[in-house]
Swiss-Prot record:
It comes from Rattus norvegicus. Component of the THO subcomplex of the TREX complex which is thought to couple mRNA transcription, processing and nuclear export, and which specifically associates with spliced mRNA and not with unspliced pre-mRNA. Plays a key structural role in the oligomerization of the THO-DDX39B complex. This is THO complex subunit 5 homolog. The modification Phosphotyrosine is found at residue 225. The modification Phosphoserine is found at residues 5-6, 307, 312, 314. GO terms for cellular component: chromosome, telomeric region; cytoplasm; nucleus; THO complex; THO complex part of transcription export complex; transcription export complex. It comes from the Eukaryota. The keyword DNA-binding does not apply. The modification Phosphothreonine is found at residue 327. Pfam families: FmiP_Thoc5.
Length: 682
């Protein structure tokens, strides 16, 4: 290779300062492009392994030539210049070979990169296609899920059952031979039948609407006719007023009252209806009326009107409210007044008794508490002289107390009210009963209200059956209460004058001559009764409640004085009075130290039925007092006389007794046998 390269002549290079012509430049470019492309083609034909071996060989030759040149130069002889030149030429040839190999390597590298880039582009294209396919798969899966979860409108339609469908649907819709085995066709057929039924119902609906419009037109015509009749009827009613007054048939007044009753709250309305029905059916003397402002009652049901004030007025109001801010006490008072507010209308019942006395009952309804209250007043045909001891008999606070046992009307019957009271600081309703009335349980029942204690409810509906079941019994109890109180009122007037009134029907219960007499009859307070030493057993037994009335009677005969403490239950005369005795004669004697005093108490407390007299037993109290006078006579007359004392006996025996004493306790004969007129033991 070195000999061939040395024989070749170097090409001449012509350098010139001027710029080559255009034709020469184009020809050189064409040659370069051809050479470049020939090298690229040669790269495809050459083996990279052989080029690598050629590269290693060329490098070794260059190393060898460089070493020889260095050795020749180190000798320093003149003959070696030609050899050095030859070796230099050979080295240049090897350098040309390395350059060519370098170019080929770069071309291979470029082709490899291009191929790698093309392969990468293909991989990216395939990856993008894969991503697109995965997205399409995911989208299709979502659509499939939506399709599976899709609920058709027909599933919300309540179709008829299969039995009803095949029994009622016509054959052209049911198609039993097709739909029996195909659920899809069966559902379509059922939907067709549903559509057919709805079309029929729609047709019927249109017919009903047309009929409704016709009926409405007829109603309007009749309303116009009736409205034209109203003025005529009013004139007829106005003209018939004198006839109604003459025949005692106040139809116009009753009509107005019924119109007013429409504005009553439900409990008062139930009371009004049931009391009116009871008066018409059972008691003609019972009169029912409505009092109060109808306009205020109507205003309760009207929605508040929106008032739009000017800005100046609103600013003035804001300034006033900021300047005058109510205190906490004023706010609580306003809340209490609002909670205890009564309905504007009330129901008045006038219950007439046999002696022409009238019990006036005014029923109120507390709207926020949902309870009813009552105020009572008794009027008599003749003005009564009120004795001192009868002051509480006809008082509105006690005349209706305990009409039913335990119903004193001092606390609310609605358990839910206590929670309402706690919010506004009301401890009990007792402080407001004089102003509002008493919320007795029987009043709630007359209004149809029932409050269960187990489950307190804020709202309780009025029930007509509840009112009707208690109306008759309550009216009878009210009449009995008024008659018994009036009878006691008259009896107390005599008792305060020391006279025990005994009617002719009860004269047979006592002997003809009674020496002991009543000298004092007075009312006493509950606290004073509790302090008496001979009434402790009554107090401990719980018979001395604060709703009872307490009296003290003093019976005298000579030096003997008998004190009788009387407990009068509000339910008198159904519940008898209870007596406790204390005899001051030869010492103080009570039921704790004298068996005969205990026997005297038993005669009036236990054997009271003998003293009731004719019904309704209003003479029981006076008969008991008269019996006490007789018992004191027997006690004193049967007492043994001390022989050491000279002179006549203080209490000579005037009563006929079969036997003066009996038993070791020396009991006296206190039982009076009225046909024979003698006394005996029980």
């Amino acid at each position: 290779m070195s000999s061939e390269s040395s024989k070749k002549r170097k090409p001449k290079v012509i350098r010139s300062d001027g710029t080559p012509t255009e034709g020469k430049r184009n020809r050189s470019d064409t040659e370069q492009e051809g050479r470049y492309y020939s090298e690229e083609a040669e790269v495809d034909l050459r083996d990279p392994g052989r080029d690598y071996e050629l590269y290693k060989y060329t490098c070794q030759e260059l190393q060898r030539l460089m070493a020889e040149i260095q050795d020749l130069k180190s000798k320093g002889s003149k003959d070696v210049a030609i050899e050095i030149e030859e070796r230099r030429i050979q080295s240049c040839v090897h350098f040309m070979t390395l350059k060519k190999l370098n170019r080929l390597a770069h071309i291979r590298l470029k082709k490899g990169r291009d191929q790698t880039h093309e392969a990468k582009q293909k991989v990216d294209a395939y990856h993008l296609q894969l991503q697109n396919l995965l997205y399409e798969v995911m989208h299709l899966q979502k659509e499939i899920t939506k399709c599976l979860e899709f609920k058709s409108k027909h599933e919300e339609i309540d179709l008829v059952s299969l039995e009803e469908f095949y029994s009622e649907a016509p054959p052209n819709i049911s198609k039993a031979e097709i739909t029996m085995g195909d659920p899809h066709q069966q559902t379509l057929a059922r939907l067709d039948w549903e559509l057919e039924q709805r079309k029929r119902l729609a047709e019927k609906y249109r017919e009903c609407l047309s009929n409704k419009e016709k009926i409405l037109k007829e109603i309007e015509v009749k309303k116009e006719y009736l409205s034209s009749l109203q003025p005529r009827l009013n004139s007829i009613m106005q003209a018939s007023l004198p006839v109604q007054e003459y025949l005692f048939m106040p139809f116009d007044q009753a009509h107005k009252q019924y119109e007013t009753a429409r504005h009553l709250p439900p409990p008062l309305y139930v009371l009004f209806v049931q009391a009116t029905a009871y008066g018409q059916a059972c008691d003609k003397t019972l009169s029912v009326a409505i009092e109060g402002s109808v306009d205020e009652a109507k205003a309760l049901f009207k929605p508040p009107e929106d008032s739009q004030d000017d800005e100046s007025d609103s600013d003035a109001e804001e300034e006033q409210t900021t300047r005058r801010r109510p205190t906490l006490g004023v706010q609580l008072d306003d809340k209490r007044k609002e909670m205890l507010k009564r309905h504007p209308l009330s129901v008045l019942l006038d219950l007439k008794c046999k002696d022409n006395s009238v019990l006036h009952l005014t029923f109120f309804y507390l709207m926020n508490l949902n309870i009813m209250t009552v105020k009572a007043k008794v009027t008599t045909a003749m003005e009564l002289i009120t004795p001192i001891s009868a002051g509480d008999l006809l008082s509105p606070d006690s005349v209706l107390s305990c009409l039913y046992p335990g119903d004193h009307g001092k606390k609310t019957p609605n358990p839910a009210n206590q929670y309402q009271f706690d919010k506004v600081g009301i401890l009990t309703l007792r402080d407001y009963v004089l102003e509002l009335g008493h919320p007795y349980l029987w009043v709630q029942k007359l209004g149809g209200l029932h409050f269960p204690k187990e489950q307190p409810q804020h709202t309780v509906m009025a029930d007509h059956s509840q009112s009707a079941s208690h109306m008759e019994t309550t009216m009878k109890l009210l009449k009995t209460r008024v008659q018994s109180r009036l009878a006691l009122h008259k009896q107390f007037a005599s008792l305060e004058h020391g006279i025990v009134p005994v009617t002719s029907e009860c004269q047979y219960l006592f002997p003809a001559k009674v020496v002991s007499r009543l000298v004092k009859w007075m009312i006493m307070a509950h606290e004073d009764y509790m302090e008496l030493h001979f009434t402790k057993d009554i107090v401990e037994a719980g018979l001395a409640g604060d709703t009872n009335l307490y009296y003290l009677a003093l019976i005298e005969r000579g030096t003997a004085k008998l004190q009788a403490a009387v407990v009068l239950n509000p339910g008198y005369s159904s519940i008898p009075p209870v007596f406790r005795l204390c005899l001051n004669w030869k010492g103080e004697k009570t039921n704790s130290n004298d068996d005969n005093i205990r026997a005297m108490e038993s005669e009036v407390n236990v054997c009271y039925r003998e003293l009731c007299g004719p019904r309704p037993s209003h003479q029981l109290l006076t008969n008991q007092l008269q019996r006490l006078c007789v018992l004191l006579d027997v006690y004193l007359e049967t007492e043994s006389h001390d022989d050491s004392v000279e002179g006549p006996k203080e209490f000579p025996q005037e009563k006929m007794c079969l036997r003066l004493f009996r038993g070791p306790s020396r009991m006296k004969p206190f039982k009076y046998n009225h046909p024979q007129g003698f006394f005996s033991h029980r």
